[in-house]
Amino acid sequence: MPLLKIKALNNNTTLYVWKITESFDELFRSVALKDVSLARLEGMKAESHQKGFLSVRRLLMEAGYIDFDLHYDAFGKPHLADGKHISISHSHDFSVIVISQENIGADLELLKEKTLKLAPRFMDVTHLKGLSETDSLQKATVVWGIKESVFKIKNEVGISFKDHIFESDFNLNDKQCKVTLRFNNKEEYFHILFDFIEDYVFVCAFNSVSLSDV
């Protein structure tokens, strides 16, 4: 079944997961798109991106919305017409949306060896010490998703994943951790939830504490 999961992350935040098994035509016939969305869809070269785009619109329908309720600001951040926050992610055969009363950022990542090889570029690799190769890959992918999720909330030019976004050390079984963003002489704090969906990592960041001077 394409709609894989609906899960409450907290009292006012819901995750919707779609596993893409349909053809492009099946997905296209199942949604109504506004003109700007149709133009965006037609501009996508890869069918996988087109199917991801359409599956997100199916998830919107599951959440009680349609494509006409969704718009993007000048920075590419999605917004809903009713004022609720939304974050969107698509990776290969899966799409997710998270809808919340809170400011959130969500990311979905396929587990792949390349992420572990690149880990020194975006994280404190001492957090991988003593782990098996499998656990190291999972943890590095979670950390990448954490930093993507935080960036989706802030979306400010100049933020470096390695130099500005710092995750507390965590165990994979915890499925949560804390993150600090140190940028422009400010500190901001985030609460992170993560989970594993087949061969993917799902991460959601919540903006937990207001900005304060360092």
Question: Locations of the language-model features?
Answer:
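Core catalytic alpha/beta fold that binds nucleotide/phospho-ligands
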Residues: M1-V214
